[in-house]
A protein has these predicted regions:
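TPR/TPR-like (Sel1-like) alpha-helical repeat modules
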Residues: 58-65, 107, 121-147, 160, ...
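Structural signature of tandem alpha-helical TPR/SEL1-like repeats
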Residues: 12-20, 47-66, 92-104, 128-135
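Alpha-helical segment of the N-proximal tetratricopeptide repeat
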Residues: 1-31, 38, 44-55
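Transmembrane alpha-helical hairpins and terminal membrane-anchor modules
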Residues: 192-262
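Short coil turns that delineate tetratricopeptide repeat
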Residues: 30, 75, 110, 144-147
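Canonical positions in the second alpha-helix
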Residues: 24-25, 69-70, 104-105, 138-142
Length: 317
């Protein structure tokens, strides 16, 4: 009866009353999976005027605790696994725990490919490209056994990101736990500057080249239509081939993002103080969710240094 009242209160928009009743339900029946899942969702803030509201660290942590209980009682609740993965990685920055979380989903649903997508993304973010490649191979084999155009397209995009980032890493790698890594000097040199946006890069680099080539084409080709088609083709072609240059220019941002992810994953600090108070750091951290920033602030205050021998605990395939 209390559970029905809780659902009714939620439908009427009284989230606070609904949450209180759901909590009462689990206090009486700890095995009520639906009530635990409701607590996980109702703990999160409600969207306001079409704008997605982000949870703070306490809300995210409370929701995550309820999600853990949900999947323990109902391992087949795919929606709960997805929400848990998003909170753990996107809102709390616990990427290493995220790998373990998706291992749990594999145990519950061995044929589900979502865990592999998520784990590859985490490994790429943390710079573990060899392991990411191994997971991708398994993912490709799984998709071959259950053909799907959407999954194939998604896997293709993920592989493109992997190959692009892995290629960049082969040119210049970065291990945040190593305070003597040369890439820290690169980040430090660029700490007073913001990254170059793709729009700015296209306007200041790609468009002038296209304009010059287009002007030359107009002098040679009499047809306006042909010239327009050539300009469009040149624009997309140059934009595609110049993307690698943009990635190189923005390496400091990419490396700093990795260092921040390592800090949040390990619970220990590795970013030098001169970089932490820089314009680049402020730009990067503002893109993270409020709960991520809040948790990172707690880690910063603890001041416990990241050991040089730290390494990610990657689940075996």
């Amino acid at each position: 009866m209390i559970w029905l009242d809780a659902m009714e209160a939620n439908e009427e928009g009284d989230r606070g009353a609904a949450l209180a009743m759901a909590e009462e339900v689990v206090s009486l029946d700890e095995g009520h999976a639906d009530a635990w899942f409701a607590i996980a969702q109702w703990t999160l803030p409600i969207d306001s005027r079409g704008k997605q509201m982000m949870p703070d660290m306490i809300q995210a942590s409370k929701s995550m605790a309820a999600i853990r209980k949900t999947v323990e009682l109902d391992p087949q609740n795919e929606h709960a696994w997805k929400i848990g993965g998003e909170i753990m990685v996107g809102h709390l920055g616990m990427l290493e725990h995220g790998l373990v979380w998706w291992e749990g989903r594999k145990d519950a649903a061995p044929s589900n490919v979502l865990p592999y997508f998520e784990q590859v993304s985490i490994l790429i973010r943390l710079g573990y490209f060899e392991e990411a490649g191994e997971y991708l191979e398994v993912l490709d084999r799984m998709i071959e056994s259950q053909p799907s155009k959407s999954l194939e397209a998604r896997a293709g995009r993920l592989r493109g990101i992997y190959e692009e980032q892995a290629s960049m890493e082969r040119e210049l790698g970065f291990e945040p736990q190593n305070s003597k890594d040369d890439s820290w000097d690169l980040i430090s040199r660029m700490r007073k500057k913001k990254p170059i946006t793709e729009t700015y890069f296209l306007l200041m680099f790609v468009m002038p080249i296209v304009f010059l080539l287009g002007s030359a084409a107009m002098m040679v080709v009499p047809s306006t239509l042909v010239v327009m088609l050539l300009i469009i083709a040149m624009y997309f072609g140059i934009a595609r081939f110049s993307r690698r240059l943009l990635l190189k220019l923005n390496r400091p941002e990419s490396f700093l993002n990795r260092a921040i992810d390592v800090e949040c994953s390990s619970g220990k600090v590795c970013v030098p103080d001169d970089i932490r108070v820089s314009k680049l750091y402020s730009y990067v951290i503002k893109k993270r969710t409020p709960s991520f920033q809040e948790r990172l602030g707690v880690i910063e205050q603890s001041g416990e240094p990241l050991p040089m021998n730290w390494s990610l605990d990657v689940p075996e395939l």
